[in-house]
C-alpha cells in the first residue's frame, strides 16, 4: 500500500467517524471547498454544490436521518495523481450498501468531492460471482 492510499483510507475513515458520531462540523471539514462536489444518498435525487451537499449531511446527522450505526467494511483505495476513490460496503442495521467515495487533494489534504451509496440486494438474491 502506498502512502497516498493510506492517506485516502484515513480520510475515508474520518468520513465514517463523522457519520457514526453525527458530527456535522467534522463532516463539513471533510468536503472539498474548491473543487465541485456532488452526493447521491440512497433514494435521493443527486445533489450538486457544496451548500446542497453539506446541508444534506447536516439534516441527516442532526434530524434523525442517519442509521443508528454504520460501519465501513472492505475499503479499497485507488489513487490517480491528485484524485482518489474508495469503494467499500456500508454495513447498517438490516443490510449493506455499496459506496463509492471520491477525493481530491486540496492544499495537501484529501477532501471528499463525491459520495454515492446504493442498497445491495440480500445475500440470497445477489448474482453469481458477487464478491462479499
Regions found by a protein language model. Give the residues of each.
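A beta-strand edge to alpha-helix "cap/lid" segment located at domain peripheries
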Residues: 1-29, 37-132
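Helix-to-beta-strand junctions that scaffold the AdoMet/dcAdoMet cofactor pocket
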Residues: 32
Amino acid at each position: 500500500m502506498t502512502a497516498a492510499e493510506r492517506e485516502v483510507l484515513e480520510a475515508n475513515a474520518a468520513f465514517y467517524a463523522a457519520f457514526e458520531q453525527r458530527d456535522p462540523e467534522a463532516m463539513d471539514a471533510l468536503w472539498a471547498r474548491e473543487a465541485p462536489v456532488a452526493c447521491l444518498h440512497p433514494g435521493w435525487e443527486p445533489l450538486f454544490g457544496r451548500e446542497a451537499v453539506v446541508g444534506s449531511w447536516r439534516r441527516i446527522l442532526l434530524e434523525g436521518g442517519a442509521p443508528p450505526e454504520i460501519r465501513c467494511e472492505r475499503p479499497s483505495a485507488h489513487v490517480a495523481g491528485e484524485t482518489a476513490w474508495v469503494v467499500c460496503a456500508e454495513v447498517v442495521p438490516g443490510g449493506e450498501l455499496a459506496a463509492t467515495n471520491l477525493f481530491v487533494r486540496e492544499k495537501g489534504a484529501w477532501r471528499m468531492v463525491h459520495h454515492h451509496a446504493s442498497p445491495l440486494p440480500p445475500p440470497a438474491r445477489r448474482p453469481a460471482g458477487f464478491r462479499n
